[in-house]
Amino acid sequence: MNRIGKVSRKTKETSISVEVNIDGKGQYKIDTGIGFLDHMLEQLSKHSLIDLKVKAKGDTHIDLHHTTEDTGIAIGEALKKALKDFKGIKRYAHAMIPMDETLTRVAIDVSNRPYLIWKVKLKVERLGEMDTELFKEWFQAFSQSAGITLHMENIYGDNSHHIIESCYKALARSLRIALEIDPRNKKSIPSTKGSL
């Protein structure tokens, strides 16, 4: 079974196309025009095993906010399309990911009830060309458009690159588990309500 979602999103600020394959192998082709964001999205694809294609063009002459946020929106929308009716998924997952001196914890509920808890403090204002405040914007946009409750907490760490990379990797590992088809519950929606 291939759960594939495609989204094209065009505004006066950005033009973005995204394709996800939840049942992929973690292959990616990513070009947002923002080097550090590309690196993080590569981690997301590789460690979730979700194939991810992203092509984004934005008003980066102003700043990177619109491209970062709209990329999160488009990836979330594509993921939600690929899930269709949420049938058979495990729904809940969590991961604790170390990266050298850093440890980050993520818990998710793929419930169509978007919410972000963000307990991450970065020690620098920029990583590469990105303002570090944009990472929260990306995760907020992603969780809202994907319909995912996302709790993200950096427990400790000193290096801001390691902290944010561990956030993307922990989300990736959580998605890998939560989006798997449960062999004991393949045809059922994981909710007593009967829908998500």
Swiss-Prot record:
Q: What is its EC number?
A: 4.2.1.19
- InterPro entries recorded: IGPD_sf (IPR038494), ImidazoleglycerolP_deHydtase (IPR000807), ImidazoleglycerP_deHydtase_CS (IPR020565), Ribosomal_Su5_D2-typ_SF (IPR020568)
UniProt xrefs under Gene3D superfamilies: Imidazole glycerol phosphate dehydratase, domain 1
Q: What does the entry list under GO cellular component?
A: cytoplasm
EC class name: lyase
Keywords for this entry? Answer: Amino-acid biosynthesis, Cytoplasm, Histidine biosynthesis, Lyase
The entry assigns this protein to a family as follows:
Belongs to the imidazoleglycerol-phosphate dehydratase family.
- Read off the HAMAP family from this record: HisB
Q: Name it.
A: Imidazoleglycerol-phosphate dehydratase
Native organism is Pelagibacter ubique (strain HTCC1062)
Q: Which gene encodes it?
A: hisB
